[in-house]
Amino acid sequence: MSVSKLSAKEIKKVPQLLGETDVIRTLTLLPGISTVGEGASGFNVRGGNADQNLIILDEAPVYNSSHLFGFFSIFNADAVKDVKLYKGGMPANYGGRLSSVLDIRQKEGNSKKFAANGGIGLLSSRLTLEGPIIKDKVNFMLAGRRSYFDLFFPLFDVPELDQSIAYFYDFNAKLNAKISKKDKIYLSAYFGRDQFSAAELFKFGWGNWTSTLRWNRVISPKWFFNASAVYSDYKYQLGADGTTPFEWDSRIRNLVQN
């Protein structure tokens, strides 16, 4: 099995682009990984195509991992615990892709004390909150990010831009509960969206929504049991409001129980 693992701390050591740490762009620095091109967040593994990579976030498949036409990935580095990339010999529980599996896990939150972390970049700002609800038993993590380059449109004094929209945002959440010495419940979710429109010429947007509920039980020092319910929903919308208005919607949605 060929697998590379990166922690959030290692990912943040990589030089940032426009103040944003990009998880997928960091992977292109690993052996056998190449970018699909400048200004794109996809990646190729050992000659495979970008659509041959299975990307999962807390067990939920992600069908579009890009913000801003591929300029950034949807994964907020402040909400990521670690990243595993399987480049060959993928485990049997992963399927549907030929090239690789990118397994991203969200942070579980601080179980001892409350903490906050944030940052302001050239294109977006972010904020992460984490802490205990019941100390050492129930804890949470919340992270949000939004771009604000659309707020500068009025400064250009172009009437068409005043009616234009261009932004992205995403939210990450995770709740962990230790219900007994042997049982834990994990609930995680992600929601993100990109929205663009140019006056009455066109409008389009896309977004992902994933959620995972997992029960973990320790049977013995060598054995444990996991049961998961995973939901993933991807939407893409295209339309226009001019003389020939139209709306076109596309959607991929699935529910998996493991």
Predicted regions and their residues:
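Short sequence motifs at beta-strands and strand-loop junctions characteristic
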Residues: 17, 36-37, 119-121, 163-167, ...
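Structural signature of outer-membrane beta-barrel domains
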Residues: 50, 60-62, 107, 123, ...
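Transmembrane beta-barrel wall of Gram-negative outer-membrane proteins
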Residues: 121-146, 160-195, 203-231
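Periplasmic N-terminal accessory/gating domains of Gram-negative outer-membrane beta-barrel systems
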Residues: 1-90, 101, 107-108
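Short glycine/proline-enriched turns and hinge-like loops at secondary-structure junctions
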Residues: 95-97
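Membrane-embedded beta-strand positions in outer-membrane beta-barrel channels/transporters
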Residues: 24, 42, 82, 87, ...
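Extracellular loop and loop/strand-boundary signature of outer-membrane beta-barrel proteins
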Residues: 67, 113-115, 157-161, 196-202, ...
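Short strand-turn segments of transmembrane beta-barrel domains in outer membranes
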Residues: 70-73, 81-91, 100-131, 139-146, ...
